[in-house]
Amino acid sequence: MVSFTTLLAGFVAVTGVLSAPTETVEVVDVEKRQTIGPGTGFNNGYYYSYWNDGHSGVTYTNGAGGSFSVNWANSGNFVGGKGWNPGSSSRVINFSGSYNPNGNSYLSVYGWSKNPLIEYYIVENFGTYNPSTGTTKLGEVTSDGSVYDIYRTQRVNQPSIIGTATFYQYWSVRRNHAPAARSRLRTTSNAWRNLGLTLGTLDYQIIAVEGYFSSGNANINVS
């Protein structure tokens, strides 16, 4: 995550890993709270996705409803979170909780569309690395009083939800970090469309915590 290329390779790889929950961390109410290995699926009414690059030091836990937690220490690259599948361009996503990164990390709305194949991010908070570094700003949008800067990048022959492909990535990066916020997908998607950045049919859409060789903890609730 020192660069877009390194970061996004970790993000994209989420889509290629499938496994089932492996172990509960509580004897009581195990259906509502589970520590899991890498994988995707549904938990307590929400879609989840969790991937890591094989390094130890990351614990991802699905909680009740839309809640999840991540604890990481001297980890490699990972990304995990909860949301919906399919996504919606008109959804209003509320999230709250605590997010305490020490180093490179992001808290974002993350998802994909097909036809066209697009990978997109609405970055609400980040640690020491701003994902807009080294890119050209296309515009900005204001949502609920916060300003987001808009960028587009391209990935060539990289993993995606349909296999190896070449595709664009859309980015909206919030200027003021938010530990809790409301993300209005319609506002963002309209701003992207006005800049010629169109989305296709939406695939999964989650609030994701990502880290790259860093430490920290997060307890997030999505609704």
UniProtKB/Swiss-Prot annotation:
UniProt signal peptide: 1-19
The enzyme's first-digit EC class, named in words, is hydrolase
PROSITE patterns for this protein: GH11_1, GH11_2, GH11_3
Compartments where located: Secreted
Alphabetized, the UniProt keywords read: Carbohydrate metabolism, Glycoprotein, Glycosidase, Hydrolase, Polysaccharide degradation, Secreted, Signal, Xylan degradation
Q: Where is the GH11 domain?
A: 34-223
One annotated GO molecular function: endo-1,4-beta-xylanase activity
InterPro entries, from UniProt? ConA-like_dom_sf, GH11/12, GH11_AS_1, GH11_AS_2, GH11_dom, Glyco_hydro_11
Q: How does it assemble?
A: Interactc with tomato LeEix2 receptor to trigger its internalization.
Q: What is known about what this protein does?
A: Endo-1,4-beta-xylanase involved in the hydrolysis of xylan, a major structural heterogeneous polysaccharide found in plant biomass representing the second most abundant polysaccharide in the biosphere, after cellulose. Acts as an elicitor of plant defense responses in hosts such as tobacco (Nicotiana tabacum) or tomato (Solanum lycopersicum). Induces the production of ethylene and leads alterations in membrane function with rapid efflux of potassium, uptake of calcium, alkalization of the medium, increased leakage of cellular components and necrosis in plant hosts.
Q: Which family does it belong to?
A: Belongs to the glycosyl hydrolase 11 (cellulase G) family.
What protein name is recorded for this chain?
Ethylene-inducing xylanase
Q: Lineage from the top down? A: Eukaryota, Fungi, Dikarya, Ascomycota, Pezizomycotina
The gene from which this protein is expressed is EIX
